[in-house]
């Protein structure tokens, strides 16, 4: 059980924001919201609220995004009319490197990288998202930005417990990720993206590496259907 104290934005027209409120969470669900001066739910009588020193917003959780790419308009490969059947295909498009890969690489390594990422996160907030997955791979400390970054979540330990890969990993690397999951990490993996039959091999590799667990967050998986 968890109790969070701070300014609470309700987004309910018949219920004003709470300047000093407490939000109660149990079993992964919001149990109640009230003023700090009000009596808590009975099961939270001995739970001390955690001071967030900020504002608590309701919001969407986006578990699949590419934040830096969100700076650009939607990319479309010129001249192609047939849909792709595998995530291994579109990187070979003539304009992909110039219009997608190169700009993202420049943005992530520029002196203004933090500002660039903040702008992309502001776009997410405008759409109602308050937690997002898909932060660029970097050693720079982005945690604590406008939107909660799932990839960089430390859960208060100071240690990154979430790893991710948008690229297909070989079996030996998957086995390393499986060991990290057994040690308590979470692994976000782009898996079997497309409809081509060969993509099923990616799922078999994940299975053979013993990565199928509750700590695997598998994205796409369209070839499994």
What are these regions (language model features)?
Residues 1-45, 54:
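N-terminal metal-binding scaffold of metallo-dependent hydrolase/deaminase domains
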Residues 2, 59-61, 187:
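Residue-level marker for buried hydrophobic side chains located in beta-strands
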Residues 6, 23, 28, 53, ...:
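Divalent metal-coordination and catalytic microenvironments
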Residues 9, 66-68, 137-138, 192:
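Catalytic metal-binding/acid-base residues of hydrolase active sites
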Residues 34, 65, 71, 133-137:
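Glycine-rich, histidine-containing beta strand-loop boundary motifs that form or position
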Residues 35, 71-74, 145-146:
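Short, solvent-exposed loop/turn and secondary-structure capping segments
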Residues 54-122:
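Metal-associated gating/positioning segment near the N- to mid-region
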Residues 128-217, 223:
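Metal-coordinating catalytic core of metallo-dependent amide/deamination hydrolases
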């Amino acid at each position: 059980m968890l109790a969070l104290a701070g300014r609470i934005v309700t987004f309910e027209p018949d219920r004003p924001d709470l300047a000093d409120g407490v939000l109660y969470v149990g079993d992964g669900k919001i149990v109640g919201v009230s003023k700090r001066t009000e009596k808590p739910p009975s099961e939270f009588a001995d739970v001390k609220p955690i001071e967030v020193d900020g504002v608590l917003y309701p919001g969407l959780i986006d578990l699949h995004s590419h934040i830096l790419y969100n700076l650009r308009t939607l990319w479309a490969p010129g001249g192609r009319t047939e849909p792709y059947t595998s995530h291994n295909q579109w990187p070979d498009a003539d304009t992909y490197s110039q219009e997608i890969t190169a700009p993202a690489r420049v943005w992530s390594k520029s002196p203004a990288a933090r500002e660039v990422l903040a702008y992309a996160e502001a776009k997410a907030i405008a759409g109602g998202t308050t937690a997002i997955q898909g932060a660029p791979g970097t050693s720079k400390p982005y945690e604590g930005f406008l939107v909660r970054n799932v990839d960089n979540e430390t859960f208060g330990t100071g240690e990154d417990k979430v790893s991710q890969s948008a690229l297909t990993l070989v079996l030996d690397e998957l086995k390393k990720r499986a060991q990290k999951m057994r040690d308590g990490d979470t692994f976000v993996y782009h898996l079997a993206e497309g409809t081509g039959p060969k993509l099923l091999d990616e799922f078999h590799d994940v299975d053979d590496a013993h990565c199928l667990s509750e700590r695997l967050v598998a994205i796409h998986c369209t070839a499994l259907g």
